[in-house]
């Protein structure tokens, strides 16, 4: 997504978006281990940078801050995701700046975070995790305190409209309006962002 971008569907609900202008995946992990993904700081054209802006993927409120300058932003209302109309939480970590205070509110598209190298980190990056929920008052963490409650694959929580896909990995990233794969379907040959969409987005003038 782009700075100050707001994407609202025809029913009035926001669309959950990838929160940066460029996606450059740090490590392409096996699918069973990708509830948390790391992204490197790059410009909208894919060039290295420092302190890459991170925009609110939806209008929401900070509901948690903790170690590694991490924080959780929760949507104020249900938003469109590839999994349906859900409440969404996103955990981000490692900014060099202190996270926003709990109860801080951010409009979709507003910058609320940056990449960094703070805490348990091995180079500047953005660590990010998503959870999708039906109940906005649900617990924040899984039993044992590791991992977001309701955690999910990132491509099941957001869309990548208006994001430059420099290194997206081989995952099912979708544009809003596309149909997610059928659960249980053999997607090995289909896995990955469609080449024709990727090519069109790479050629798009920014």
Residue positions per predicted region:
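Histidine-centered catalytic micro-motifs
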Residues: 123-131
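Acidic, glycine-anchored pre-beta loop/turn
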Residues: 99-110
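Conserved positions in beta-strands of structured domains
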Residues: 61-63, 93-96
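Short peripheral tails and domain-boundary helices/loops at the edges of structured domains
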Residues: 131-168
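Surface-exposed, glycine-biased beta-strand/turn segments
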Residues: 1-74, 78-81, 107-108, 117, ...
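A short macromolecule-binding patch
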Residues: 84-93
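Enriched but not universal
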Residues: 188-206
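Short alpha-helix capping/helix-loop boundary micro-motifs
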Residues: 46-49, 96-100
């Amino acid at each position: 997504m782009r700075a100050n971008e707001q994407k609202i569907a025809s029913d009035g609900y926001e669309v959950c978006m990838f929160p940066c202008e460029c996606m450059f995946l740090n490590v392409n992990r096996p699918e069973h281990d990708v509830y948390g993904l790391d992204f490197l700081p790059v410009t909208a054209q894919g060039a290295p940078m420092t302190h890459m802006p991170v925009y609110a993927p939806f209008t929401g409120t900070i509901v948690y801050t903790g170690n590694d300058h991490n924080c959780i932003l929760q949507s104020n209302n249900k938003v469109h995701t590839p999994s349906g109309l859900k409440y969404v939480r996103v955990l981000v970590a490692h900014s060099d700046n202190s996270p926003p205070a709990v109860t801080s509110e951010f409009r979709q598209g507003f910058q609320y975070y940056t990449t960094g190298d703070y805490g348990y980190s091995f180079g500047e990056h953005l660590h990010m995790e998503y959870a999708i929920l039906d109940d906005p008052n649900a617990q924040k963490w899984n039993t044992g305190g590791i991992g977001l409650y309701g955690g999910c694959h990132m491509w099941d929580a957001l869309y990548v409209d208006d994001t430059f896909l420099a290194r997206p990995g081989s995952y099912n990233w979708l544009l809003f309006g596309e149909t997610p794969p059928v659960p249980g379907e053999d997607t090995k040959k289909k896995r990955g962002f469609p080449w024709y969409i990727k090519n069109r987005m790479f050629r798009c003038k920014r």
